[in-house]
Structures are given as C-alpha cells and as structure tokens.
Amino acid sequence: MNTEKLETLLGFYKQYKALSEYIDKKYKLSLNDLAVLDLTMKHCKDEKVLMQSFLKTAMDELDLSRTKLLVSIRRLIEKERLSKVRSSKDERKIYIYLNDDDISKFNALFEDVEQFLNI
C-alpha cells in the first residue's frame, strides 16, 4: 500500500473516531445507534413494525448481533428517539415506530452530523 492510500485510510479513521466521540459527548449515542436509527427511519416511519421482524432485517442489513441491536434499540427508546408499544391482543408482541417528535429529532440529529462532517 502506498503512502497516499495510507493517508486516505488514516483520514477515514480520524473522521470515524471524531464522529464517534462527538455523538457520544453531545447525544450519548453510538455509531451503532445512528445506524439503527437510520434503519428505523427507512422501515418504521410510516407504520408500526413488529420488533422481531425489525431485528431480523437489522441483523441482515447492519451485520450486528441481536444483543447489540437490542442495546441500541433500548438506548434509543430511553433517549426518546424511538417509540414502542405492546400489542393489545398479545402482550408478548412489541411494535416499534417513529412518531412525529421522533422524526423531527432524527432530522435534527442527522443535520448536525452532516454539519460536523461537512457533507
């Protein structure tokens, strides 16, 4: 690998690390949380989605373990960036969704990230 490619790789790493530290300090979130939040925006914006179905999709698309996904989902719910509701017919079923407040927080967060990264 030549020096130019190594410098490019180092630049990506520094940007990744800086973003990770920034969102941790400002929002108390991880990059996994951002990835899960982005995926929920794609799949749960218009309707409530069964948690089990979402976990299967997220495991495939994000290549994260079930445990890491559940940690991120729980953190996002605690930070009020994602909403959940239990089924009235079967209490074992949990649905996740984004309400209007969650969507506005999502947009503000990702606009802030774009500004931070200058993209």
Curated annotation (Swiss-Prot):
GO terms for cellular component: cytoplasm. Gene3D superfamilies: Winged helix-like DNA-binding domain superfamily/Winged helix DNA-binding domain (1.10.10.10). GO terms for molecular function: DNA binding. It comes from the Bacteria. Belongs to the SarA family. Residues 55-78 bind DNA. Its main location: cytoplasm. Involved in the regulation of virulence genes. Acts as a repressor of the agr locus and consequently targets genes regulated by the agr system such as sspA, hla and hlb. Binds directly to the agr promoter region. Keywords: Cytoplasm, DNA-binding, Repressor, Transcription, Transcription regulation, Virulence. It is found in: Cytoplasm. One of its GO terms (biological process) is regulation of DNA-templated transcription. It comes from Staphylococcus aureus (strain bovine RF122 / ET3-1). The keyword Transcription regulation applies. The lineage of its organism: Bacteria, Bacillati, Bacillota, Bacilli, Bacillales. This is HTH-type transcriptional regulator SarX.
